[in-house]
From Swiss-Prot:
Residues passing through the membrane, by range: 8-28, 44-64, 82-102, 125-145, 177-197, 225-245, 257-277
Renumbered residue ranges of the record's region Disordered: 308-327
Cytoplasmic compartment residues: 29-43, 103-124, 198-224, 278-335
Protein family (similarity comment): Belongs to the G-protein coupled receptor T2R family.
Name of the encoding gene: Tas2r119
Residues annotated as glycosylated: N81, N163
GO molecular function: bitter taste receptor activity; G protein-coupled receptor activity; taste receptor activity
UniProt keywords, alphabetically: G-protein coupled receptor, Glycoprotein, Membrane, Receptor, Sensory transduction, Taste, Transducer, Transmembrane, Transmembrane helix
UniProt cross-references to InterPro entries, sorted A to Z: TAS2R
Biological processes per GO annotation: detection of chemical stimulus involved in sensory perception of bitter taste
Primary location group: membrane
Protein name: Taste receptor type 2 member 119
Amino acid sequence: MMEGHILFFFLVVMVQFVTGVLANGLIVVVHAIDLIMWKKMAPLDLLLFCLATSRIILQLCILFAQLCLFSLVRHTLFEDNITFVFIINELSLWFATWLGVFYCAKIATIPHPLFLWLKMRISRLVPWLILGSVLYVIITTFIHSRETSAILKPIFISLFPKNATQVGTGHATLLSVLVLGLTLPLFIFTVAVLLLIYSLWNYSRQMRTMVGTREYSGHAHISAMLSILSFLILYLSHYMVAVLISTQVLYLGSRTFVFCLLVIGMYPSIHSIVLILGNPKLKRNAKMFIVHCKCCHCTRAWVTSRSPRLSDLPVPPTHPSANKTSCSEACIMPS
C-alpha cells in the first residue's frame, strides 16, 4: 500500500508524463507534416524534431522506471534495458545542448571571429552535429556496454532498501567517466546560454541608452532572457538529479527520492512547453489543437443534449399487426 505523499507524487508524475507527451507529440507531428508537405526540414525544425522524439522515448522510459520503483512492474525488466535508457537520456541532453548553441549563434551578437564563423555556418552544421552526437553516444556506450550495465544496474537496485548495494571500487573510475560524459553537454549548454543572456542584456542596455528609459520597455528582451534562464535552470536540475541518483544515497519511499522523480519528469515536459510558447508556428498549432478539442467537446455535448431520452422513444404497438411494421418506420424519432 502506497503512503499518502507517495501516491500524491505519483499522480503528479502521471500528469507530467501526459503533459510532456502531448507537448513533444505536438512538436513531432507539426514538423513531420511540414516534412511530408515540403520534402525538407529547416535546421531549427530538425533540432526540435529530434529533441522531441528523444524526449517522448525518454518519458516512456521514465514512466516505466517509476512503475518499477512503485512495484507496479517487475524491476528486472528495466534493469535489462537500462543501457538503452542511458543512451536516450544522453542523446536528449546533447540535442538540447545544440539547440541552445543554435539559439546563441542566431540571436547573440558577439564581435569575435570564432563566433562570427559559427554564426555563418551553424545552419549547415546542424545535421552533422546531430549525427555526430548519435554516433558519439552509441559508440562510447557500447564500447563500455558491459561495464556500463554493471554500474547502472546496482545504482537502480540500490533504490530498493532490501537490495541496497554499492558500486565496486573497480568501477569507480568508469562511473566518473559516465558522469563526465553528461558534464560535457552541460558545459557547452551553459556557455551558450550565458553568452546569449549577456548579448541580450547588452543589447537591451544599448537600446535603453539610445531611445531612452521611458520610451523603451524591453518586455520582449526580458521575456526572452527569462525563457533562456529557465532552460538553464531545468538543465542544471536534471543534471544534478542524475548525479545525485548515481551516488546511491537515495532509496525508494524517501521524500528526497520522490522529489527527484518530479525533477526528472519536469525537465522534458516543461522545457518543451516553453519551446512551444516561444515558437510562433508551434504556438499557433497548439492554439488550433486546443480550439479543435473544445469544438469536438462542444459538439459532443450538443449531440448528447439533443439525443432523445429512453422515456421519449415511441412505445411499440401491442396490436398483432405491429409485426408488419418495417424497421425503418419503427426507428423514426419524433420531431
